[in-house]
Amino acid sequence: MRVQGQLDIPLNATGRWQAKKVADELIGVEFDAVVSSDLLRALETAQLSIVRKGVLPAPTGQIQLQPELRERHYGMFQGLKYVEAQQQFPEDFAAHANRHLEFAYGNGESLSNFAARVNKVMSALAEQHAGNTVLVLTHGGVLDVIYRMATGLPLQAPRNFPIPNAAINWLEHANAQWSVNDWANCVHLERALDELAP
C-alpha cells in the first residue's frame, strides 16, 4: 500500500464502483450542500455520487471545492509503499508510527498543523451551513482528525477505530460540539458484494 497524501491521483475501478455504491445508499437523503476536497479522488467520488442519483443540492447546483479538506501532506513519504518508507527512513518512520505531533516528513505537514487545519475547516463549515445537512467528501487522515475532534481521543493516541474507503460517517454539530451518530458504515458495500455472490 502506498502513501498517497496529497498526490493527485484519480480513482481506480474499485474506487469508482465504491463511489457509485455510496450514491445508491444516499438515495432519498436531501443535502443542502456538497463540499469536497479538491484532490481528484475525492472530487471524482463527489461527481459520481451526485450525478448518479441526482443528489446535487439547490440552489447552487455545484460542488464546493475546499482545499483545506485535502489529505495530510506526507512529504518524503508520498508515493512510497509503507515498507519502502520504513526501510529508507527508519527514524522518521518511527516518528510517524508513534504519532509524533511535530514530525513533518521533511517538507510535509506535522500532525499538529494538520489537525489545526482540519479543525479550522470543520468549524467554518459548521458555521456556514448551520442547521443544514451537508455531504462532505474527504480523506482518511482528515477523517481520523474529525473522529478525534468528536470523541475527545487525543491526537497522539493510537487509532482504535476503522476508516474504510467509501464508508459513510454521520456526524452532527450542535452547541459548538461535534458528535458521531454513525461511523464506518459499509453496509452499502457489503450488500453490493452479496448481490455479486453466486
Label every PLM stretch briefly.
Residues 139:
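Short basic (Lys/Arg) and small-residue
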Residues 74-84, 127-132, 148-198:
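Acidic, low-complexity terminal tails and accessory targeting/binding regions
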Residues 25, 48-52, 124, 128, ...:
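Active-site catalytic microenvironments for nucleophilic, acid-base chemistry
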Residues 30-32, 130-134:
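Short coil/turn segments at beta-strand junctions that form active-site/ligand-binding loops
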Residues 21-93:
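Phosphate-coordination/substrate-recognition cap region in phosphate-metabolizing enzymes
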Residues 41, 142-143:
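Alpha-helix capping/helix-boundary segments
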Residues 2, 92-105:
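Short, basic/glycine-rich phosphate-binding loops at helix/coil junctions
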Residues 1-48, 52, 104-119:
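Loop-to-helix element that buttresses phosphate recognition and phosphoryl-transfer chemistry
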